[in-house]
């Protein structure tokens, strides 16, 4: 068995928001031909189907979600055999002081697990975005290079684990500081409308391939 399919046992304690969101998703179907946006608040806080003008896009984001949280609810999504799944998760794991290689390999493990549930689904993994911890996020202070290291490992594993790595980081980073550019955020972590517009433009080639 592929060792990456085995869970990495990262911390996972579902809160009330997670449970409510999962219970909501239980009433929403995923079908063949659908495109699923899967992940944390960065996924959840966007009306993807409207922004990308595609009614087949389904939002399966949960604020505060982690790699193991996504893994826990993945079967309900993959059992619908969607056409494509775009994953954005990991920044909340970074805030839990977990080593970058552990987080990155947990994401790779998640992707292998998704493949095992629906082999024909095309999988895409976004790079983690830069952030600016000087706003409200003390738990992310000093962890800028953790994100860089995670992205490097993900990119290195894309071919061998049959997923497409979607580079976002360099498009969102301020070239002078390396932090999330002020044009795309008001809190140093989450995105404004301009940020999501940029993200959508970067996704277009993958939606049509």
What is the meaning of each model-derived region?
Residues 38, 44-52, 56, 67-105, ...:
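Oxyanion-hole/transition-state-stabilizing segment in secreted/luminal serine hydrolases
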Residues 9-12, 54-67, 95, 188:
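Acidic/histidine-rich helix-loop elements
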Residues 118-122:
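A short helix->loop->beta-strand "cap" motif at the edges of active sites that frequently abuts
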Residues 130-209:
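Catalytic His-Asp segment of secreted/periplasmic serine-dependent ester chemistry enzymes
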Residues 37, 57-59, 165:
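Conserved beta-strand scaffold positions in the cores of enzyme catalytic domains, especially
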Residues 100-110, 143-151:
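Charged helix-capping and loop-helix junction motifs
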Residues 1-36, 44, 48-49, 53, ...:
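N-terminal secretory targeting modules
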Residues 23-36, 71-79, 108-116:
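Short amphipathic alpha-helices and their capping/turn segments at secondary-structure boundaries
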């Amino acid at each position: 068995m592929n060792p990456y399919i085995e869970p990495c046992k990262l911390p996972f304690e579902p809160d009330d928001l997670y449970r409510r969101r999962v219970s909501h998703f239980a009433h929403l179907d995923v079908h063949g031909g659908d495109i699923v946006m899967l992940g944390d608040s960065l996924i959840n806080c966007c009306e993807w189907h409207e922004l990308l003008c595609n009614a087949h896009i389904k939002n399966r984001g949960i604020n505060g979600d982690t790699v193991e949280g996504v893994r826990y609810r993945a079967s309900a999504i993959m059992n619908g055999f969607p056409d494509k799944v775009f994953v954005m998760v990991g920044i909340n794991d970074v805030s839990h002081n977990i080593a970058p290689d552990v987080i990155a390999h947990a994401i790779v493990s998640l992707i292998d697990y998704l493949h095992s549930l629906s082999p024909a689904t095309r999988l895409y993994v976004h790079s983690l975005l830069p952030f600016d911890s000087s706003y409200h996020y003390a738990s992310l202070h000093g962890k800028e290079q953790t994100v860089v290291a995670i992205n490097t490992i993900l990119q290195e594993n894309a071919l061998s684990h049959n997923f497409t790595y979607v580079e976002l980081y360099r498009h969102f980073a301020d070239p002078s500081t390396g932090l999330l550019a002020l044009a795309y955020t008001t809190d140093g972590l989450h995105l404004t409308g301009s940020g999501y517009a940029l993200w959508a433009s970067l996704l277009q080639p993958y939606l049509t391939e």
